[in-house]
Amino acid sequence: MDEVKYPVLTEKSIRLLERNQYTFNVDSQSNKTKIKNWIENFFDVKVIAMNSYRLPEKGGKRVSMIGHPIRCKRVIITLRTGDSIPLFSEQ
């Protein structure tokens, strides 16, 4: 579970649940193929689409630091109709 860090619960991600789309923060070095394979094997679902983006850097003071720290990457996955991830299911 090094690839996927944790699920994201924001207003946008909750709205996307209605369209069978789930949001996760993942390791910044992971690629889409690794993430897709991990999610399909771990949750036993079929991923039909995936979008990823890097989170913007945090502002603040940086003393003698060149560049900026790489934060995690966020992915939005779309599952086929009928599949769901139990972490997000309503009870």
Swiss-Prot record:
GO molecular function: rRNA binding; structural constituent of ribosome
GO cellular component: chloroplast; ribonucleoprotein complex; ribosome
Keyword hit for Secreted: no
Keyword Transferase (UniProt): no
Record family assignment: Belongs to the universal ribosomal protein uL23 family.
Physiological role: Binds to 23S rRNA.
Protein name: Large ribosomal subunit protein uL23c
Protein encoded by which gene: rpl23
